[in-house]
A protein has these predicted regions:
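Short beta-strand micro-motifs enriched in acidic
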Residues: 26, 114, 252-256
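A short glycine-rich, hydrophobically flanked beta-strand micro-motif that places a catalytic Asp/Glu
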Residues: 2, 104-111, 245-251
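Internal "kinase-insert"/substrate-recognition segments embedded within catalytic cores
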Residues: 48, 52-63, 69-83, 98-104, ...
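Short, solvent-exposed loop/turn and secondary-structure capping segments
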Residues: 19-20, 31-42, 65-68, 87-89, ...
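Short, solvent-exposed loop/turn segments that connect beta-strands within catalytic domains
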Residues: 12-16, 115-122, 256-261
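Middle-to-C-terminal accessory/interaction subdomains
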Residues: 44, 181-244, 248-396
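Conserved NTP-binding catalytic cores of kinases and kinase-like/nucleotidyltransferase enzymes
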Residues: 1-90
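Metal-dependent nuclease catalytic cores in nucleic-acid-processing enzymes
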Residues: 89-99
């Protein structure tokens, strides 16, 4: 539920103000109040705690003054379970460096929250500012998508693109208390037509075989982009994804025609990466797991259906090896250098009024199953995540 707020943003010395915007809390398992406890706000003596914020500048007033540089929504995310203050920043940066233009834009920022009536604002420290995936996201990439007037779905847990499994799955709009498996984010057709299009894709994936499937995949999907996207996804150790856990992605069809479209997978939610490993799906080690068997292909068939063809598989394997080659963007020395440069920029600002997350540490999430992984403190071949992942890729 949104509440009214005013927003002030400073970008490279230039200030922007939006009055009467909307703000709400965001997150699934990570959603919590910005103030500890269940009571009302404690004036000038609040027990602040980190949480995620979603801003909608045009929630209440829909005019051009309620945008900032053409943007009307913004997602501010705290570095939950990421003492390294870099996992999602690194992930989207790597996507973009590798030519995956469907990856959202993000950056570091500093956040203050001022509750009306309090003497001073609370400093929340260093946050991650994320672009939201919506109609504005599509418009900014319309030349590459071919059209921004198609159908955009947010795929929540259980979205397998498996026709037999998902033909009766929930598809529609979220009502705030319930999120369907396939959640409408932006559609330019009626819901029935959008559903037919989504089910057509799944059914084609199930029914077509051999050369007919190969050719349809090449026509319906930007195969090179898709496989480079998935190469980055696997290099990052993203186990909570489509292939392994039927979770955390968007899909976009660039037309409203139920049978004639281009399908795009948009990567999403990359904080549990880079050595934050977990016993999930077919995996128990996100560093060493076989990149060709990343998930259960019977449950989530799309990637395996593509990789069964030698020419498509070569694109994927070549992309993985390009990433971790000595000249690649995932090579451990280059990756460590980028992370250290970011830390030099933000290090003086992480101490904050919540008292949480006040030190940068090279540790994966405490609930993970491989606590030995490191990003920059060690370059050991058995514990440095970049080197462990590269070794797994070189076996292909």
């Amino acid at each position: 539920e949104y509440i009214h707020c005013d927003v002030k943003i400073k970008i490279k010395g230039e200030e922007y103000t939006v009055t009467d915007a909307g703000v709400r809390l965001k997150g699934n398992t990570s959603r919590r109040r910005p103030e500890n406890g269940n009571g009302k706000h404690v004036k000038d003596n609040a027990d602040w705690q980190h949480c995620h914020f979603q801003f909608n500048f045009r929630k209440y007033v829909k005019d051009e003054e309620h945008t900032i540089r053409g943007v009307r929504k913004m997602y501010l995310k705290w570095f939950k379970d990421d003492a390294a203050y870099c996992r999602e920043i690194f992930s989207y940066d790597l996507f973009r460096r590798f030519g995956v233009w469907t990856a959202l834009e993000n950056c570091y920022c500093r956040l203050w929250v001022h509750v009306e009536g309090d003497k001073n604002p609370a400093y929340y420290g260093v946050y991650e500012m994320n672009e939201t995936i919506d109609d504005t996201f599509l418009k900014m990439r319309k030349d590459k998508f071919g059209s921004h007037k198609g159908n955009l779905w947010k795929c929540n847990y259980g979205a397998s693109l498996n026709y037999d499994r998902d033909k009766n799955a929930s598809m529609g709009e979220s009502d705030g208390s319930y999120d369907p498996v396939y959640e409408v984010e932006e559609i330019n057709s009626d819901l029935s037509t959008a559903k037919s299009q989504l089910l057509h894709f799944m059914k084609q994936l199930r029914d077509l075989k051999g050369q007919q499937l190969h050719d349809w995949l090449g026509q319906a999907i930007d195969i090179n982009l898709f496989l480079r996207t998935y190469a980055v996804n696997v290099a990052l150790g993203m186990w909570d994804d489509y292939w392994n856990n039927t979770n955390n992605f968007y899909i976009y069809f660039n037309s409203t025609d139920p049978t004639n479209y281009k399908f795009y997978l948009i990567p999403y939610d990359y904080d549990n990466t880079l050595g934050t490993s977990h016993n999930c799906g077919v995996q128990n080690d996100s560093g060493r797991h076989d990149p060709l068997k990343w998930g259960n292909s019977d449950t989530s068939p799309l990637v395996a259906k593509i990789l069964q063809f030698d020419d498509y598989k070569k694109i994927y394997v070549d992309a993985l090896k390009e990433l971790c080659s000595s000249n690649g963007e995932f090579y451990y020395t280059k990756s460590i250098a980028r992370i250290k440069a970011w830390h030099a920029m933000i290090g003086d600002y992480v101490v904050n009024d919540t008292g949480e997350d006040t030190k940068i540490k090279d540790r994966p999430a405490g609930w993970g199953n491989h606590s030995e992984y490191r990003l920059w403190e060690s370059d050991d071949t058995n514990t440095n995540f970049f080197r462990v992942k590269a070794a797994a890729i070189q076996k292909l």
